[in-house]
Amino acid sequence: MSKRRIAPLTFLRRLLLRILAALAVFWGGGIALFSVVPVPFSAVMAERQISAWLGGEFGYVAHSDWVSMADISPWMGLAVIAAEDQKFPEHWGFDVPAIEKALAHNERNESRIRGASTLSQQTAKNLFLWDGRSWLRKGLEAGLTLGIETVWSKKRILTVYLNIAEFGDGIFGVEAAAQRYFHKPASRLNMSEAALLAAVLPNPLRYKANAPSGYVRSRQAWIMRQMRQLGGESFMTRNQLN
């Protein structure tokens, strides 16, 4: 009886270890491959695509029009750094002081959860993982973040982030966003347009770049002030990000 009980547990343990090993190889290979190859698809795109199919939207196609950093306005890179992660050039994937502040805030305000994810963490999550707040997902995100910070340059992380970020329902990547909202390529985005796109990133399915609310407009103005305080376009050059 005891052996019969132990055998299934041993099998499940071995199965779990094999699955984790396979995922590690898959993700490790992905990190190595995407350090030089354009990213054709992300986990978020896959999630949106499956949801569309399940909802009967068979004409929906989630994709991103990849562009290199040379074809992205420096204002756009600066805007997302100003909005999401001002210590991006300095840290190794995690902003510890920001995490501590977020934890303290969330303890006091359980109904209004604040995140502290860096651009590196967001890139790891959007590229490889499902959405959610489980400890398992956060643990995997941390490992993947360390992986891309080790293998990729900061410029590469920012390039991938801008190409897979969601800027609206079914609008993935800065090139698609620039074409949809401003009818121009990403290389021609100005400071105001870049700040507006960055302003919707916390929740691109709720906040609209083509119909910005008062909150989005105020956030856009705040981002522009932060961009100036960081030093404008010279910030990108100083940190070898363009």
Curated annotation (Swiss-Prot):
Q: Name one GO cellular component term.
A: peptidoglycan-based cell wall
GO molecular function list = pentosyltransferase activity; peptidoglycan glycosyltransferase activity
Give me the segments passing through the membrane: 19-39
Record carries keyword Phosphoprotein: no
Reactions this protein catalyses: [GlcNAc-(1->4)-Mur2Ac(oyl-L-Ala-gamma-D-Glu-L-Lys-D-Ala-D-Ala)](n)-di-trans,octa-cis-undecaprenyl diphosphate + beta-D-GlcNAc-(1->4)-Mur2Ac(oyl-L-Ala-gamma-D-Glu-L-Lys-D-Ala-D-Ala)-di-trans,octa-cis-undecaprenyl diphosphate = [GlcNAc-(1->4)-Mur2Ac(oyl-L-Ala-gamma-D-Glu-L-Lys-D-Ala-D-Ala)](n+1)-di-trans,octa-cis-undecaprenyl diphosphate + di-trans,octa-cis-undecaprenyl diphosphate + H(+)
- SUPFAM superfamilies assigned to the protein according to its UniProt record, in alphabetical order: Lysozyme-like (SSF53955)
PANTHER family the UniProt entry points to: BIOSYNTHETIC PEPTIDOGLYCAN TRANSGLYCOSYLASE, MONOFUNCTIONAL BIOSYNTHETIC PEPTIDOGLYCAN TRANSGLYCOSYLASE
| Function field | Peptidoglycan polymerase that catalyzes glycan chain elongation from lipid-linked precursors.
Q: What is this protein called?
A: Biosynthetic peptidoglycan transglycosylase
Gene name of the encoded protein: mtgA
